[in-house]
């Protein structure tokens, strides 16, 4: 039976291999990313068109998290045997193009199952104690930024940084399904 972290749940730690060693080193833990201000944990991959179309916005969200004193990390849980674009060597190639956060490989898919992640991109915002305060999408138009009329993740980050609870704590992620083994 698989778990699923929802707002109010405290996330368990993880330690995963990092494809972006310029940020975080070879192995990265949740504890090393989580700051007293919180952290964003993103499930993403290389090939999903929703992720590809959101890269600039994801990078801006990571930079904003940094400005707010929050950590930011992403996890690729797709099956690398069925989806070669998402294997570790291709993760490293993507990270080398410029990525302002650690990019972790969940090759066993244990973390995606534990967290209940279903899509890429899918975001979890944690407070400084590791409690999920927001889960869901970046905004309501991952394929076309000009059509976005919401910014739930960034709004939740702003609320958390001001010591407030996010107004919206849960949205449905819009993207590709995680490619399970």
Which residues are covered by each model-predicted region?
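Chalcogenol-based redox active-site neighborhoods
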Residues: 1-170, 177-181
